[in-house]
A protein has these predicted regions:
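RNA pseudouridine synthases
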Residues: 1-174
Length: 174
């Protein structure tokens, strides 16, 4: 139904049949299915929340990456909310209004706050032990295609991200 970038942890939805696929696709298109992510970014985000609205397209210099562009891209909208600040790092909740490839990673890097451990958009070494970027698909909310019941699912943080958050809360690496 939707993709998770390589090395992004968390919850995904898969359709069991064609009718469910159609219903869920329509919900994603109509933005009635909600997807929320947690990220640990490098830097101290000053604003408590915001909306990032840009165009995103393939990077001209590296076809494996995406980039914010002035024209010729697809609309990409990400809402973000700062949950905790730790000197050099911030924990942020992101909600997708659109679902572009690498959208959160590109948007946070565009603001100057790349994801910790992101090998594509933030190749700097990190003091944390993490496989890939610190990005977790935390919640997914949608209407059941057959029953019409509103469903909400939440995935706990993976161990490596949980350790990062714990170390930040203990005052390490601030």
């Amino acid at each position: 139904m939707h993709r998770l970038d390589k090395d992004t942890s968390g919850i995904m939805i898969c359709a069991k049949n064609d009718a469910a696929h159609l219903s869920l696709s329509q919900q994603i298109q109509a933005k009635t299915a909600q997807r929320t992510y947690l990220a640990v970014v490098r830097g101290n985000i000053k604003t408590d929340s915001g909306v990032i609205e840009t165009l995103i397209a393939r990077d001209k210099n590296d076809r494996k990456k995406m980039a914010v562009v002035k024209e010729g891209g697809r609309d990409a909208v990400t809402e973000y909310e700062v949950l905790e600040r730790f000197g050099k790092y911030t924990i942020v909740r992101c909600r997708l209004r659109t679902g572009r490839t690498h959208q959160i990673r590109v948007h946070m890097e565009y603001l100057g706050y790349p994801l910790v451990g992101d090998p594509k958009y933030s190749p700097m070494k990190t003091p944390f032990s993490i496989q890939g970027q610190a990005l977790h698909s935390q919640t997914l909310e949608f209407t059941h295609p057959r029953t019409g019941e509103r469903l909400s699912f939440e995935a706990p943080l993976p161990e490596d991200m949980h350790k990062i958050v714990t170390r930040l809360r203990l005052g390490q690496f601030n």
